[in-house]
UniProtKB/Swiss-Prot annotation:
Record organism: Pyricularia oryzae (strain 70-15 / ATCC MYA-4617 / FGSC 8958)
Domain LisH: start-end pairs: 9-41
Any one GO biological process: cell division
UniProt name for this protein: Nuclear distribution protein PAC1
Coiled coil: 61-88
One cellular-component annotation, GO: cytoplasm
Complex and partners: Self-associates. Interacts with NDL1 and dynein.
Electron transport is among the record's keywords: no
Entry's family note: Belongs to the WD repeat LIS1/nudF family.
WD repeats: from-to residues: 114-155, 157-197, 201-248, 251-290, 295-355, 357-396, 401-444, 446-461
Length: 461
């Protein structure tokens, strides 16, 4: 048999084997091999054996790591090949110019570092190029995502910051944060992020917050209401102008991990450790649990309501002849779970599709503003893009988005353009009729991710 090793390599291998046998108390085998190879005690003494000790194990583990890396690269190559196979020159050109078809590139524009612990949450300012991140280091950091620079660090919470969100009345945008210290805090970006109010009331960690939208146009507008979700199993609705809790909603039987309001502020979608997704109707005096969706096999980490732009694609999954009216809300929704799956639901609580592909907990998801795609991130360190037009097929996987678990994902809200004037209305601030068209919203092709690796990454066109 012809050896593929050089004489020098063969000698090194023999010495490593003898050292391995000696270190594992197989002295007779080591002596027999030394004798057969002609390695006398003066040639292969104790010092030499010590030098080669552990070499076999190191080589073995290196091979295992290389095999895993090869498998990961093959998987990524297959995903890229699949994406290429599904693309045409026209679709590729369109993706580069049409914001409704934009998907993030594999490499981020910026990788921002300053936090000293896990980043749990991120939120974009609805107008400016600011983004906030909250961390287990108990701080909130404000960054300029266009320049990739840290603007300021906010220190006030005494426990990990679990969620952040921008919103509030037009002309009075606020930043809200919530924490394991049981409080919600409001910050004024126009006054150097001064803490203007602290909202106590929850009896356990406050895990999620969102400003309640005030219109169904899809614009980045919200009013004075804020909703929070907590480990105390309640949802609370707050008036940020007074700091009062207006409603407490009960129904979940375990930790509520996420909450998502509809564009018109009429509905809330919530989910958590009771493995249910619940839709609440806020249009009545006492909020009603309109739907309870059951299907996941583990805790549910995240949920989202689909924008009207997704209705044409999701209605086909639902078997509808035509999509619901764009003015309706809460027609379709998605949930991501520790069972590694994403589920799509309709307004009747029917499970439309289970998206399988992640290899670990699904931590966050967001619908593409263009409507065709759903994006998700996971503890498997990937970002996946699911094409709703192709029956929810995963058409793009970005591997190693972070070095460790990916914890959060947000899409920059669209920029509200000037509202169109109509024959019976004006665009100078005078009252308009209710039939007026909604203002146009320009999609910003910017997303951000945060991770246990303490890095905030910006993906932009």
């Amino acid at each position: 048999m012809t050896s593929i090793l050089t004489p020098r390599q063969a000698e090194e291998l023999h010495k490593a084997i003898i050292a391995y046998l000696s270190a594992n108390n197989l002295s007779s085998s080591a002596t027999a091999l030394r004798t057969e190879l002609g390695l006398a005690e003066d040639v292969f003494d104790a010092a030499t054996a010590k030098k080669y000790e552990g070499l076999i194990e190191k080589k073995w583990t290196s091979v295992v790591r290389l095999q895993k890396k090869i498998m990961d690269l093959e998987s990524r190559n297959n995903a890229l090949q699949s994406e290429l196979d599904n693309a045409t020159p026209l679709s590729l050109a369109k993706r580069n110019t049409d914001p409704t078809a934009w998907l993030p590139a594999p490499r981020p524009r910026y990788s921002l570092e300053s936090h000293q612990n896990t980043i749990n949450c991120i939120a974009f300012h609805p107008v400016y190029s600011s983004i906030a991140s909250g961390s287990d280091d108990c701080t909130i950091k404000i960054w300029d995502w266009e320049l990739g620079e840290l603007e300021r660090t906010i220190k006030s919470h005494t426990r990990p910051v679990l969620d952040v969100d921008f919103g509030g009345p037009r002309g009075g945008i606020l930043l809200a944060s919530c924490s394991s210290d049981l409080t919600i805090k409001l910050w004024d970006p126009s006054d150097d992020y001064k803490n203007i109010r602290t909202l106590p009331g929850h009896d356990h960690s406050v895990s999620a917050i969102r400003f309640m939208p005030s219109g169904a146009s899809g614009a980045a507008m919200s009013g004075n209401l804020l909703v929070s979700a907590s480990r105390d199993m309640t949802l609370k609705i707050w008036d940020v102008s007074t700091g009062f809790c207006l409603k407490t909603i009960r129904g979940h039987t375990a930790w509520i991990r996420d909450v998502y309001p509809s564009l018109d502020g009429r509905y809330l979608l919530s989910t958590g450790d009771d493995s249910t997704v619940r839709l609440w109707d806020l249009s009545v005096t006492n909020p009603e649990n309109r739907l309870t969706m059951i299907g996941h096999d583990h805790y549910i980490e995240c949920c989202a309501l689909a924008p009207p732009s997704s209705y044409p694609f999701l209605s086909r999954l639902a078997g509808l002849k035509k999509p619901p009216a764009a003015t309706s809300t809460a027609e379709f929704m998605a949930s991501g779970s520790r069972d590694k799956t994403i589920k799509l639901w309709d307004a009747r609580g029917t499970l439309l599709k289970t998206l399988i592909g992640h290899d670990n907990w699904v931590r966050a998801l967001v619908f593409h503003p263009g409507g065709r795609y759903l994006l998700s991130v996971s503890d498997d360190k990937t970002l996946r893009c699911w094409d709703l037009e192709q029956d929810g097929k995963c058409v793009k996987t970005i591997g190693d988005v972070h070095e460790r678990f990916v914890t959060c994902l947000r899409w920059a809200p669209g920029v509200v353009m000037d509202a169109p004037a109509e024959a019976d209305g004006q665009s100078n601030g005078t009252p308009r009729k209710k039939t007026e068209a909604a203002p146009a919203v320009r999609i910003r092709c910017v997303i951000a991710t945060g991770s246990v690796d303490m890095k905030l990454r910006i993906f932009a066109n």
